[in-house]
Amino acid sequence: MPHDQPLSRIQTRNRRVILDAALEEFAAAGFAGVTLDRIAAAAGLSKPNLLYYFASKEAIYTALLDDLLDLWLAPLRELDPAGDPQAEILTYVRKKLALSQSHPRESRLFANEVLHGAPRLGPVIAGPLAQLVADRAALIRGWAQAGRIAPVDPHHLIFSVWALTQHYADFEAQVRAVLGPAHDPYAEAGPFLETLYRRLLAV
């Protein structure tokens, strides 16, 4: 599709329909398990029509991953050096849990990519993502060194937030099966995680 002209309303809608359909397919089957024919069928479009918007399966997958990373990393970027350290970190935890609840397919897509060695995201993870984490880790380390939060390894603190929030999306079937239908995993996880991190960070 030509990129030097603004999209019409119909083109914008069709592009969104394709990405939504592809997200569902990739999150369920991974990159290797999905074909352009399958995405086109899920989107309700012909394959030639789909190829008007995206040149390949890889292009669709890359567009999804790019959108996901922007969404996923925004809360980490928003840590405010001028804010209260414990409040900033707890807000980050809440935002990450909310993203897992509102975007479970995106979380599973990212997990699937990483579990396969991040063949398409490797340079981004080793570059911009690693740099952002290093910057935020330096901020958290500074807070700890100033005695504003308890001493913690900042990288592993960030990893723990990823693990403890994204688990509820990536392993949703397991969580719901173990807890049973009477439980709301996200409503219960929120207070638990807040207590956990308050205790971890308290000085």
Predicted segment positions?
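Amphipathic alpha-helical segments used for helix-helix packing
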Residues: 101-123, 171-179
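Helix-turn-helix
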Residues: 17, 21, 25-59, 63
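Amphipathic alpha-helical linker/stalk segments
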Residues: 2, 62-91, 133, 139
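N-terminal intrinsically disordered/low-complexity leader segments
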Residues: 1-13, 24
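A contiguous binding-surface segment within folded domains or other stable secondary-structure elements
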Residues: 111-141
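C-terminal peripheral helix-coil segments that are non-catalytic and often amphipathic
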Residues: 1-2, 98, 102, 130, ...
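Hydrophobic/aromatic residues within well-ordered alpha-helical segments
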Residues: 14, 57, 64, 68, ...
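Hydrophobic alpha-helical connector segments
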Residues: 77-108, 146, 154-161, 190
